[in-house]
């Protein structure tokens, strides 16, 4: 039984990976990135999440390696703390309490026991760079209140701050100003570019800055796409700068290589540019990276780069400008038109992704599985261009079919509308376009749904539109003369007094179709397409419509724009009950009778879980989110929970996810955020908490078979070998972090000694009597050996202190031959 705990709202993934620059480990094996309240540690080779560092109570705003120990990581947050982590083991070492909001973090090897952070001044839009001294203490929580002012009136973005020439100076940019602070002189030089007010069409605004690691050179990016290289900036009057120009739009980020021989730049062109020797002639390109480059990072070893993109993606790039790995998070589109769907096959969350794409996102591993290109056109990044939007999507026939709707409307009278139907192909394990229908309706499509009844003989799709009609589309096999191809055709067109059709849905058994026409709900027979009855409460236009399920399949629910939730009984064709509730999201659970409704109020969003047969809610939780909730979906559980409390039983078979206006993906759980967000590799344990890797699933059965054969062999040989998992030396060898292990010579001797057999295992008394005749002979020889052993012991007790040298007896030779026959191949499996 599950221990009863309070249900809490937890973030289940989808946080921004591109919020801050990613940071490489010293050996380039790991990459760290900010993800909401957490810091995620990814492998640069496998792209898998190795650790999730959780402990901050607010948004993490900066991460940096500890310059004095490259196996440790600093992080800062809006919660006013700086935390020190051991990222190898995922352990929090120490917390420094600063006490004010921290917006960025910087470290310098030259500044011992100090870090640099960006904090708020008195006014909310004015920030300053300060140095924080980290006191040495044995306690895990330490107050760090000693702040030293460095620079004032700076930008809060860490891209606008850079330390140069091994910490000799720090540069900061804001608007049209460049400030350089020299630590030894404790002086500040300021440089100004002409503003757009003084020069026509000028876009000299600073957007980012980077400093040469060993020379006095500052690179600044600008709104007009230019890169300026500043030199001789020790003198306010004799400074010089040169321009590099390739980007047609603003420069988003800059980064020097470790040696400083090349400069990396990126922007909205989705192209990484490498300026070698900082000249116009020597530049290399890595194009088609898929989205705007937000950040650029360089590994301390210099062998890897990485770019963070606006589509919540991190690309790891080799020194020769070849992409080697992609870490893709939940893509946050400008607006989610399709809502949240669940792919019946993969149980992946499906919603709008990149422009014109559907993204399939794994809720278990918090990573994107793949993208499906729906529009199949090249995306042009232009602010004034009206793009084709993917507005609707729905799965049908248990994942065998996918329907999508795309539209583009430049003027009210110029509507481009397309509906596409995709068939799942088992060979390619993906969706293939089957039918494309131009202008399926004369106006925008408001809803579409499949008939997903188990007994449905023919796939059926219904679309509703503002043109006042709903259309029924069926799959036919007469699309060519050979009848080998299938396609979708319109089978029926229905309307109700030319009202706009706003919603549609099928009953659980597929026998009825409900279509809402503004304030009126109509019920149609799905066989004859005859109108059965209508419901009209005049409570406003129907916003949401759904049938009850299982024992509540006789009920139909509708939520109106005026804040009324209605429940109709289909058997009596009458209103069962209604409630005043401003429902923004209403989703039925596919595995139970429960329905989740999220209402919007001036304070925030509230959750109500109820059954249509009972107007009293099963569960109510106020204030699940301060912002507006846009979409929700139930996801069936692979392994049901076993909550006994009536208030929590709605979570037994399915889990409810919802998406807020800021596109934060949240869910309800009794587990803490740490337990909820622990990666799969930490949940599946094997062999004393060793993580289950993909190789384990490939070789696991083979290992088990080998172990079984080994056990049989050992039983036949009647020799009891020690269990390796119970040997402290081996456990210590396998579980101790590599950086704290002793030398290999010491480990080797300790390991070999731990495998040696004790004399007790060779005792003749432990050998059964019902063995074969050969073993009985050996037992007689062992008696002689015991006599010989007693003589040797008597001799050794004479106190002479000399080594006794003797020849092996026949019984000893037989015993050695016996050990030669033992299969020691199990050692190789360690």
From Swiss-Prot:
Spans annotated as Disordered: 763-806
Where are the N6-acetyllysine residues found in this chain? 466
Where would I find the Glycyl lysine isopeptide (Lys-Gly) (interchain with G-Cter in SUMO2) crosslink on this chain? 123, 427, 676
| Modified positions (Phosphoserine) in chain numbering | 664, 672, 779, 782, 796, 811
- The WD repeats lie at 4-43, 47-86, 90-131, 145-184, 193-231, 237-276, 279-318, 324-362, 376-423, 430-474, 487-525, 529-569, 574-611
Coiled-coil residues: none
**GO CC, one annotated term:** nucleoplasm
Q: Which domain of life is it from?
A: Eukaryota
Q: Where in the cell is it found?
A: Nucleus, Nucleolus
Q: State the InterPro entries in the record.
A: Quinoprotein_ADH-like_sf (IPR011047), WD40/YVTN_repeat-like_dom_sf (IPR015943), WD40_rpt (IPR001680), WDR75 (IPR053826)
Gene Ontology terms for molecular function: RNA binding
List, in alphabetical order, the GO biological process terms annotated in this UniProt record.
positive regulation of rRNA processing; positive regulation of transcription by RNA polymerase I; ribosomal small subunit biogenesis; rRNA processing
Q: Which UniProt keywords apply?
A: Acetylation, Isopeptide bond, Nucleus, Phosphoprotein, Repeat, Ribosome biogenesis, rRNA processing, Transcription, Transcription regulation, Ubl conjugation, WD repeat
- Stretches of Acidic residues bias are at 769-787
Q: How does it assemble?
A: Component of the proposed t-UTP subcomplex of the ribosomal small subunit (SSU) processome. SSU processome is composed of more than 70 proteins and the RNA chaperone small nucleolar RNA (snoRNA) U3.
Checking PANTHER family in the record gives: WD REPEAT-CONTAINING PROTEIN 75
Q: What does this protein do?
A: Ribosome biogenesis factor. Part of the small subunit (SSU) processome, first precursor of the small eukaryotic ribosomal subunit. During the assembly of the SSU processome in the nucleolus, many ribosome biogenesis factors, an RNA chaperone and ribosomal proteins associate with the nascent pre-rRNA and work in concert to generate RNA folding, modifications, rearrangements and cleavage as well as targeted degradation of pre-ribosomal RNA by the RNA exosome. Involved in nucleolar processing of pre-18S ribosomal RNA. Required for optimal pre-ribosomal RNA transcription by RNA polymerase I.
- Please give the name of this protein: WD repeat-containing protein 75
Q: What is the lineage of its organism?
A: Eukaryota, Metazoa, Chordata, Craniata, Vertebrata
């Amino acid at each position: 039984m599950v221990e009863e705990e309070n249900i809490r709202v937890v973030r289940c993934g989808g946080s921004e990976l591109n919020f801050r620059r990613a940071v490489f480990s010293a050996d380039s094996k790991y990459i760290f990135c900010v993800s909401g309240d957490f810091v995620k540690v990814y492998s640069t080779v496998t792209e898998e999440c190795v650790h999730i560092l959780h402990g901050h109570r607010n948004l993490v705003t900066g991460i940096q390696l500890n310059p004095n120990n490259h196996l440790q990581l600093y992080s800062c947050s809006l919660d006013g703390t700086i935390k020190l982590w051991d990222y190898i083991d995922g352990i929090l070492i120490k917390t420094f309490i600063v006490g004010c909001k921290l917006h960025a973090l910087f470290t310098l090897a030259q500044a011992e026991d100090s870090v640099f952070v960006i904090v708020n001044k008195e006014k909310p839009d004015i920030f300053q760079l300060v140095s924080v001294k980290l006191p040495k203490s044995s306690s895990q929580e330490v107050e760090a209140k000693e702040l030293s002012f460095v620079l004032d009136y700076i930008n809060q973005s860490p891209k606008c701050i850079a330390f140069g020439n091994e910490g000799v100076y720090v540069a900061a940019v804001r608007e049209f100003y460049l400030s350089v602070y020299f630590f030894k002189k404790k002086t500040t030089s300021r440089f100004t570019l002409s503003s757009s007010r003084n020069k026509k069409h000028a876009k000299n605004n600073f957007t980012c800055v980077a400093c040469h690691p060993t020379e006095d050179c500052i690179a600044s990016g600008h709104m007009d796409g230019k890169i300026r290289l500043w030199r001789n900036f020790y003198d306010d009057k004799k400074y010089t700068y040169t321009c590099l120009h390739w980007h047609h739009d603003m420069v988003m980020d800059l980064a020097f290589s470790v040696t400083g021989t090349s400069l990396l730049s990126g922007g909205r062109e989705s192209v990484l540019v490498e300026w070698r020797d900082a000249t116009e002639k020597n530049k290399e390109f890595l194009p088609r990276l898929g989205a705007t480059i937000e950040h650029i990072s360089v590994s301390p070893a210099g062998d890897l780069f990485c770019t963070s993109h606006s589509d919540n993606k991190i690309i790891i790039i080799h020194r020769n400008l070849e992409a080697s790995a992609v870490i893709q998070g939940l893509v946050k589109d400008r607006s989610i038109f399709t809502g949240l769907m669940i792919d019946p096959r993969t149980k992946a969350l499906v919603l709008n992704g990149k422009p014109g794409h559907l993204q399939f996102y794994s809720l278990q591993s918090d990573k994107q599985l793949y993208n499906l290109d729906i529009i199949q056109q090249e995306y042009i990044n232009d602010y004034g261009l009206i793009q084709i939007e993917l507005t609707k999507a729905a799965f049908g026939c248990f994942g065998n079919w996918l329907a999508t709707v795309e539209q583009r409307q430049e003027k009210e009278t110029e509507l481009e509308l397309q509906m596409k139907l995709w068939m799942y192909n088992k060979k390619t394990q993906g969706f293939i376009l089957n039918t494309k229908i131009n202008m399926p309706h004369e106006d925008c499509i408001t809803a579409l749904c499949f008939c997903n009844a188990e007994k449905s003989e023919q796939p059926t799709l219904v679309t509703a539109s503002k043109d006042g009609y709903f259309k029924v589309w069926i799959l036919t096999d007469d699309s060519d003369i050979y009848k080998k191809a299938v396609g979708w055709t319109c089978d029926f067109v229905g309307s109700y007094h030319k009202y706009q059709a706003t919603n549609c849905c099928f009953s659980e058994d597929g026998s009825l179709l409900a279509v809402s026409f503004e304030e009126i709900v109509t019920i149609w027979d799905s066989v004859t397409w005859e109108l059965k009855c209508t419901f009209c409460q005049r409570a406003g236009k129907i916003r949401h419509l759904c049938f009850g399920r299982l024992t509540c399949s006789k009920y139909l629910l509708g939520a109106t724009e005026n804040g009324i939730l209605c429940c109709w009984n289909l058997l009596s064709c009458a209103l069962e009950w209604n409630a005043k509730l401003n429902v923004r999201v209403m989703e039925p659970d596919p595995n139970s009778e429960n329905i989740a409704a999220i209402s919007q109020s001036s304070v925030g969003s509230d959750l109500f879980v109820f059954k249509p047969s009972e107007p009293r809610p099963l569960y109510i939780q106020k204030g699940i989110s301060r912002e507006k909730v846009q979409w929700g979906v139930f996801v069936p559980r692979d392994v049901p929970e076993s909550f006994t409390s009536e208030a929590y039983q709605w979570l037994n078979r399915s889990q409810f996810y919802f998406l807020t206006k800021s596109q934060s993906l949240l869910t309800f759980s009794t587990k803490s955020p740490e337990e909820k967000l622990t990666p799969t590799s930490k949940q599946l344990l094997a062999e004393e908490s060793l993580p289950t890797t993909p190789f384990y699933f490939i070789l696991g059965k083979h290992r088990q078979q080998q172990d079984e054969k080994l056990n049989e062999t050992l039983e036949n040989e009647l020799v009891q070998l020690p269990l390796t998992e119970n040997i402290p030396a081996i456990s210590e060898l396998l579980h101790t972090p590599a950086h704290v292990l002793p030398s290999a010579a010491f480990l080797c001797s300790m390991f070999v000694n731990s495998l040696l057999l004790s004399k007790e295992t060779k005792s003749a008394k432990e050998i059964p009597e019902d063995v074969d005749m050969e073993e009985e002979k050996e037992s007689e020889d062992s008696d002689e050996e015991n006599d010989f052993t007693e003589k040797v012991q008597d001799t050794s007790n004479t106190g002479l202190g000399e080594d006794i040298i003797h020849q092996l007896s026949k019984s000893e030779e037989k015993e050695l031959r016996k050990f030669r026959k033992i299969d020691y191949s199990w050692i190789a499996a360690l």
